């Protein structure tokens, strides 16, 4: 924050933002305190929506898991010796095979008896849908909707036993959030934890044997839904607080300020309330029909094996790919 303030001061002091140039400072999320992880797969297992295999090896792994031999237990031990950095090397690096050998994982799940599972962090639940998942058992239609509603109802009841407060603040069906031809790739249920002070654990399928787990060491804060937007320049109306701006309002606003037309299928809107009368005039906001053919071609164009490998490694180094 201090370095950012110094940078902005230099920009303004030396009048580097001149004429019609606009400085836009934005963050794609805010930040705040973090209290506990939610281990969603444990919660699903507790309610019978996720079941484990009954063969000897999964049963042994399950038994020692329930006794406390978990990835988070090992991580806390490493942290006590100052070796917490090794977690990134294992979880986000190339140690997934070792994790699956030592600890409970999706390899130990009985998919023929499992109706729901969780992947990713924050709050996402997928149903094990027939014809969509490799071993899906939930029939699309009424069966799917009933199970989804049952899970939503139970999520609304989840409370923190230490405080008694509800852990989940908002719950959505995927079609209430997403749209388009990639909707099938979204999780079936999405939820926002209370004040984002709880957080769905997403670095491993079964990170702990608890449902709610206080972080003993390591991170103390995490993301918030609301970010920051600051605009400065001649086209910007001073002293205005913009209400209900979204991330996807930035692109059409920037195109408009550059004097460029906005593609007709682009999400978001020009933030005219932040602009002076000259730039806020609706008649000056231009739109252009999107080139569907070029768009489809760019979406379907396949990467070479080398490019895909390079992209994957870059994403892995940032922690987005395991």
Task: Kindly label every feature range from the protein language model.
Residues 1-5:
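A conserved hydrophobic secondary-structure block that centers on an alpha-helix together
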Residues 6-22, 26-204, 252:
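Secreted, luminal/periplasmic, and some membrane-associated catalytic domains
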Residues 194-251, 257:
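Low-complexity, glycine/alanine/valine/leucine- and proline-rich hydrophobic stretches
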């Amino acid at each position: 924050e201090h370095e950012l303030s110094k940078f902005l001061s230099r920009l303004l002091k030396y009048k580097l933002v001149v004429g019609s140039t606009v400085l836009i400072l934005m963050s794609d999320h805010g930040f705040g305190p973090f209290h506990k992880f939610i281990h969603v797969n444990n919660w699903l297992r507790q309610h019978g929506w996720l079941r484990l295999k009954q063969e000897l090896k999964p049963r042994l792994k399950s038994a020692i898991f329930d006794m406390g031999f978990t990835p988070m237990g090992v991580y806390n031990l490493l942290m006590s010796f100052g070796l917490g950095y090794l977690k990134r090397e294992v979880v986000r690096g190339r140690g997934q095979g070792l994790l699956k050998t030592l600890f409970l994982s999706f390899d130990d799940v009985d998919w023929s008896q499992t109706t729901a599972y969780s992947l990713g962090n924050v709050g996402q639940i997928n149903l094990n849908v027939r014809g969509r998942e490799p071993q899906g058992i939930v029939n699309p239609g009424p069966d799917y909707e009933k199970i989804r509603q049952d899970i939503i109802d139970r999520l609304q009841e989840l409370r923190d036993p230490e405080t008694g407060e509800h852990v989940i603040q908002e719950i959505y069906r995927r079609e209430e959030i997403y749209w388009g031809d990639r909707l099938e790739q979204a999780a079936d249920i999405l939820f926002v934890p209370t004040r984002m002070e709880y957080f769905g654990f997403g670095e491993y399928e079964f990170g702990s044997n608890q449902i709610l787990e206080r972080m003993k060491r390591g991170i103390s804060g995490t993301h918030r839904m609301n970010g920051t937007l600051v605009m400065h320049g001649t086209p910007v109306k001073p002293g205005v607080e913009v209400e209900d701006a979204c991330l996807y309002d930035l692109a059409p606003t920037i195109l408009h300020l550059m004097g460029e037309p906005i593609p007709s299928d682009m999400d978001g809107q020009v933030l005219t309330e932040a602009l002076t009368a000259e730039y806020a005039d609706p008649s000056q906001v231009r739109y252009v029909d999107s080139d569907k053919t070029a768009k489809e071609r760019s979406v379907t164009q396949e990467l070479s094996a080398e490019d895909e490998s390079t992209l994957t490694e870059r994403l892995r180094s940032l922690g987005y790919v395991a």
